Swiss-Prot record:
Name of the gene: rpsB
Annotated protein name in UniProt: Small ribosomal subunit protein uS2
Spans annotated as Disordered: 225-264
One GO-annotated biological process of the protein: translation
Keyword Acetylation set for record: no
InterPro entries hit by this protein: Ribosomal_uS2, Ribosomal_uS2_bac/mit/plastid, Ribosomal_uS2_CS, Ribosomal_uS2_flav_dom_sf
Record's GO cellular component terms: cytosolic small ribosomal subunit
Organism this protein belongs to: Corynebacterium glutamicum (strain R)
PANTHER family: 30S RIBOSOMAL PROTEIN S2 PROKARYOTIC AND ORGANELLAR (PTHR12534), SMALL RIBOSOMAL SUBUNIT PROTEIN US2M (PTHR12534:SF0)
Annotated family: Belongs to the universal ribosomal protein uS2 family.
Swiss-Prot/TrEMBL keywords: Ribonucleoprotein, Ribosomal protein
SUPFAM superfamilies: Ribosomal protein S2
Amino acid sequence: MAVVTMRELLDAGVHFGHQTRRWNPKMRRFIFTERNGIYIIDLQQTLTYIDQAFEFVKETVAHGGTVLFVGTKKQAQEAVQVEADRVGMPYVNHRWLGGMLTNFQTVSKRLNRMKELQAMDAAENGYEGRTKREVLMLTRERTKLERVLGGIAEMTRVPSALWIIDTNKEHIAVAEAHKLNIPVVAILDTNCDPDVVDFPVPGNDDAIRSTALLSRVISTAVEEGKKAREERQLAAAKDAAGDAKPEAEEAPVAAEAEEAPAAE
């Protein structure tokens, strides 16, 4: 069964690139034609690259990895949050905080501060003894932290891979990932640089339907990876139980041999 069909890609407008005057010549090989001043992306290639990205994400998650979904522009925010939440993966959909990967230790401290403020807000007497102004300041701090870091609240280490919508806008995230040798999976529009992406998906990174469809493909790969991981763990547990059983059966025989009286 295909990960996604040509019809779905067409319906979502994945084939529409940028105006011909706004392009990156390195994307030439992914362009099918030009129509009314707009580049049309070769969806046959998109299908091939989607399969490669899907398998990579699936295997990454199957081996215990995590995928960070990143898309802070308006057209990507909802898709990134919805699909990441659907499969329990972290996401960034408002602002990329510099050092989010390369200085994760400091980011972790801010995450702890956010959780501290959330616990204070949830407690019955969390703000007891504080003035209205202090409560207001703490609430503002919590809201700001939640907006920027809420999607990575449960991320305890740097991710195994990144799914990025618009590598130009998220160039800092791409640079940090490269610095830490974290693979990048991303939509490549006709104005992007394919050299900065490990697993490219040629397509429209501006249309809401396109970003939603392609993010859904990646979240489905995560879902499949989780299933594969569970199956492997179950198989390993069965093998371990099978190895232990013969040992348990041999133990009484050995005990009887030790207790038998010596012949006179």
